Curated annotation (Swiss-Prot):
This is Methionyl-tRNA formyltransferase. GO terms for cellular component: cytosol. It comes from Novosphingobium aromaticivorans (strain ATCC 700278 / DSM 12444 / CCUG 56034 / CIP 105152 / NBRC 16084 / F199). HAMAP family: Formyl_trans (MF_00182). PANTHER family: METHIONYL-TRNA FORMYLTRANSFERASE, METHIONYL-TRNA FORMYLTRANSFERASE, MITOCHONDRIAL.
Length: 301
């Protein structure tokens, strides 16, 4: 098939690679424009941009697809289908209608649960036991289109980073499978029951809330690991907690209950197992405490 690919972050790269490996003619790759990154704030192309260039695919990085010129350019690629994975731009109706078979999306949840920008993080925060990937036909609504295929996977205590990587690979394989035999995947309208929305993550959400149950706090850690990183502050310094364990001890929320960084929560406690100080590499908690003692009775913010 002649395919336009549309995606931006690491999550989208396995789908692009799978389409190329399956022998499809990826005639163009659309990705968000390069963004400033690193200490020097040098413009950095997206992961999809770099992957597409490595395959010699024409890359386009418009800031919007609402203009007539961009829509004309896209239509001129004469694609059979557009495959979309975490692109990040709204697709106007003219873009949705341009490919002969429309636009198919790889979405990181079991729709209709967790429509929106942050399905993996929201699934972890909610304590979902299962999540997955849905291949859907795109329409103007936010992840409301009919579904062609789904595949499930257990959350199983995974971090957002681990779960996103797993879903990216599963979604890529499922998209290739669907494109190989579209007739075998009739579109099914999403049910009205069970709809939830995965609102974009606000960085303020990553501050650890020790007034909550320890189980919820540990989910908060996993949902924001590796980025932006759930954190607490001590004496003006930020500590990012990248992994933690739940403990059955009690104390005043936000106060350490021993000398090895067990932190009391509303119910129970957590102990970070992987932690990162500002400007330093991540380390296990024992290594941290060898260089920076945090005695019992210390209040964390």
């Amino acid at each position: 098939m002649r395919i336009i690919f549309m995606g931006t972050p690491d999550f989208a790269v396995p789908t692009l690679e799978a389409l190329v490996a399956a022998g499809h003619d990826v005639v163009a790759a659309y990705s968000q424009p390069p963004r400033p990154a690193g200490r020097g704030k040098k413009l950095q192309p997206s992961p999809v941009h770099l992957a597409a260039e490595a395959h010699g695919i024409d890359v386009r990085t418009p800031v919007s697809l609402k203009g007539a010129d961009e829509q004309t350019t896209l239509a001129a690629f004469d694609a059979d289908v557009a495959v979309v994975a975490a692109y990040g731009l709204i697709l106007p109706q003219a873009v949705l209608d341009a490919p002969r078979l429309g636009c198919l999306n790889v979405h990181g949840s079991l729709l209709p649960r967790w429509r929106g920008a942050a399905p993996v993080q929201r699934a972890i925060l909610a304590g979902d036991e299962m999540t997955g990937v849905t291949i859907m036909q795109m329409e103007r609504g936010l992840d409301t289109g009919p579904m062609l295929a789904r595949i499930e996977t257990p959350v199983d205590g995974k971090t957002a980073g681990d779960l996103t990587a797993e879903l990216a690979v599963k979604g890529a394989a499922l998209m290739v499978q669907v494109l190989a035999d579209l007739a075998s995947y009739p579109a099914v309208v999403q049910p009205e029951q069970g709809v939830t929305y995965a609102h974009k993550i606000d960085k303020a959400e990553s501050r650890l809330d020790f007034t909550r149950d320890a189980v919820d706090v540990e989910r908060q850690v996993r949902a924001f690991s590796p980025a932006p990183g759930a954190f607490f502050e001590l004496e003006g310094e930020r500590y990012r907690v990248l992994a933690a364990e739940v403990l059955g001890v009690a104390g005043e929320p936000g106060v350490t209950v021993d000398d090895v960084l067990a932190i009391a929560c509303g119910t129970g406690a957590i102990r970070p197992t992987l932690i990162q100080r500002a400007g330093r590499p991540a380390m296990d908690t024992a290594s941290l405490l060898r260089g920076r003692a945090i005695p019992g009775g210390t209040r964390l913010g």
